[in-house]
Amino acid sequence: MPNARILKIQAAAALNNLTLDIPQPFAFGTANKSPEFLQKFPTGKVPAFESSDGEVTLVESDAIAQYVAASGPAAPALLGRNVAEQAAVRQWICFAENEVFRNMMAVVLWRVGMREYDAGVDGEGAKGLEEALAVVERHLAVGEKEFLATEGELSLVDLTLASALFWAFMHYIDEEMRGRFPRVVRWYLRVVGAERVREVFGEPSLVAVRKEASV
């Protein structure tokens, strides 16, 4: 399953005509604990980024995405063309991480066999994700926005939220649920279908009926 945290980085790179060298395979749990890795990235976290000249080393996917977005000709569109847009981009990136991604993980991981089912965790995640999607739906409804923070062009926050929802649309946001958030669905398909972005996200995978726990 594609790493949802790096899709936004790869998409920002594609829009900036940048090439990322991603080592394959990467032995998570081993390679990121090696002395060589920890010398560059003391936290041992992944994803991790090193610039081609070795001068920049970063962890945390949002920081890496910010650096990549700022490193090419698409930077003004991706990061905002004025202070107000830049602040709005940052606001919605925080929202995507705090209100969407963590709740998405709570409802998706057990459905793909990466975590044991916990009714409490799943319930809280479902409630949180539903509330977050309702916020985005209301926001998009004002003026029938095409994108979250910028006028007429996608920004880094569109890539970030689409990344956070990638697994959710694949495994949790089923046909019935999509019917309650039509603007969010249209926005998502618009973003992942954008030129160069679709090369990263691929053909949208939308679950018909989500898996439910056996009781």
Curated annotation (Swiss-Prot):
Keywords: Transferase. Pfam families: GST_C, GST_N. It is an enzyme of class 2 (transferase). InterPro entries: EF-GSTs, Glutathione-S-Trfase_C-like, Glutathione-S-Trfase_C_sf, Glutathione_S-Trfase, Glutathione_S-Trfase_N, GST_C, Thioredoxin-like_sf. Residues 82-215 form the GST C-terminal domain. The keyword Protease does not apply. One of its GO terms (molecular function) is transferase activity. One of its GO terms (biological process) is translational elongation. Residues 1-76 form the GST N-terminal domain. Its EC number is 2.5.1.-. Belongs to the GST superfamily. This is Glutathione S-transferase-like protein. It comes from Aspergillus aculeatus (strain ATCC 16872 / CBS 172.66 / WB 5094). The lineage of its organism: Eukaryota, Fungi, Dikarya, Ascomycota, Pezizomycotina.
